Amino acid sequence: GIETVTYLIEGDIEHGDSLGNGGHILNGGCQWMTAGGGILHQEMPQASPRMLGLQLWINLPCKDKFVPPQYRDLSGDRIPRVREPGACVGVIAGHYGKTAGPTQGDYVKTTMLDVALEPGARFRLPTDSGATLFIYVVEGAGHFGDADKEIASHRAVLFGAGDEFAAQTGDKGVRFLLFAG
């Protein structure tokens, strides 16, 4: 069993499944589906000026492989946005500071953040040293972790164990998605 997480930054995706769920994932929305013991599911992009999003597949622990399937529609207005000097953080799953996202991950404790940093901004996040953490740079460029090299858009970076994640931008801003679990 797996969970699929479809996060749509911009666009429109029509979806449906064998449980009778259906609808549209729209700008800033997320669909969190647990396949578990089995579900038929389809997604079809709809005509829109720009389509930008991603899908993450989460492998369920052995003991949860055959849980009943379930579906959660997290519309963009249900995803809290934390605004700080130089940053805007969308909390899709898990916590950022005192702000909780609409899901924590039922089977795999998950943090999923949509982070936008202005030029010259810094971002720090305490992390679980046992978690796997990676980012995907959506737009712009920045420095992540202790890397000297600037990472630009359309790149993913996997990080080793640690107690804190750090990011900073130069003269350009950056938008990245952060996943930990």
Region spans (language model):
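Jelly-roll (double-stranded beta-helix
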Residues: 1-181
